[in-house]
Swiss-Prot record:
It is found in: Cytoplasm. It comes from Neisseria meningitidis serogroup A / serotype 4A (strain DSM 15465 / Z2491). Pfam families: RBFA. One of its GO terms (cellular component) is cytosol. The keyword Cytoplasm applies. The keyword Cytoplasm applies. This is Ribosome-binding factor A.
Length: 123
């Protein structure tokens, strides 16, 4: 009988800790005034902890590209600050990706509302 893999529980804890720490670092550690209000929504970590994809959203959609530049510019600083806060053998390389799921959800909701409004009411 195979033993259940226990690595996923640790991986989940690590990614949750990375997400919490990065959210705090982005909120307090980014000194660039061009950075808008950034929310860290999710972090995905590879099994060997060498890479972490950070999914984020911004309050002001017009600042999306500028925010991406700010995060890319601050990537090394954020990683070194993360290394001070988290005790891991290997601190993952950070990759930032805009989280479009919120926009897709809002668009889908608007489409559903539109179809519901156009549908004739049946008795």
């Amino acid at each position: 009988m195979r033993k259940p893999q226990r690595g996923y529980a640790r991986q989940d804890r690590v990614k949750e800790q990375i997400m919490r720490e990065l959210a705090e670092l982005v909120r307090t550690g980014l000194k660039d005034p061009r950075a808008g209000f950034i929310t860290v929504n999710e972090v995905e970590v590879t099994r060997d902890y060498s890479h972490a994809t950070v999914f984020y959203t911004v309050l002001n959609q017009d600042a999306r590209e500028i925010t991406e530049e700010v995060l890319e510019h601050a990537r090394g600083h954020l990683r070194s600050e993360l290394a001070k806060r988290i005790k891991l053998f290997k601190i993952p390389e950070l990759h930032f990706k805009y989280d479009e799921s919120l926009e897709r959800g809002l668009n889908l909701s608007a489409l559903i509302d539109q179809v519901a409004a156009e549908k004739p009411v049946e008795d």
